[in-house]
Amino acid sequence: MKSLLPFPIFLAICCLLIGGAAMTTSSTSAAAVDDLSPATNRELARARNATAKYHDFDRADADGYEFLQCVPGEGLEYVNWSIVDCNFDIEHPEGLHYIPENNSLRLVGVEYVVPIECTATPPAGFAGDSDEWEFMAEGLPIWALRAAIWLPNHEGMFEEHNPRIPPCQ
C-alpha cells in the first residue's frame, strides 16, 4: 500500500480476537496515536510488513486462519489456533480482523493472543507502555492485544474497539 504521507506519519495515523468481558491492564489510558515511541512504530511496521499478504483473504485461509466470530467495533475475527502459544511474536499474530467491503474482506487489524496459563500478568508486548493487553475470561482464558494497523483508529492504535468498523450483520 503506497501513501502520500511520509511513512512515520502514515504509520502513526494507522491504528482488535476473542469477544466478551475484558479488563484493560495497561498502566496508561489509550495513548494518543502520535504518542507512540519510535521503537513502537518500528515494531508496528514489522507487523504490517508481515501481515500485508493477508490483504488477500485466500492467503489467510490457506495459512490456517478460521472464522471465530463478529464483534462490534472489531469486525470479523479469524484465528490461527495452531500458532496460539505462550509467545508474543510481532510478525505472527494469532488473529486477523476483517470487515466486509465491496463483496470481499478488507484486513483492518491484528490480534495477539497468549493463554492465561502462560502468565498471570500481561505479557510483554510492543515497546513502550502504550499497548493494552486485556484479560478475556470467557472460553479459553487469554490475554489479548489488538492493533489497528490497517484501518486508522482515532481512539488509539491498541484500543479494543474501532468506531470506524461497521456493525456486525
Predicted regions and their residues:
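Sec-dependent signal peptide cleavage junction
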Residues: 20-32
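Generic detector of short alpha-helix boundary/capping microenvironments
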Residues: 7-8, 85
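Bacterial N-terminal signal peptides
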Residues: 8-20
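Positively charged n-region of N-terminal signal peptides that target proteins for export
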Residues: 1-6
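Primary mode marks residue(s) on the alpha4-beta5-alpha5 output face of response regulator receiver
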Residues: 29-169
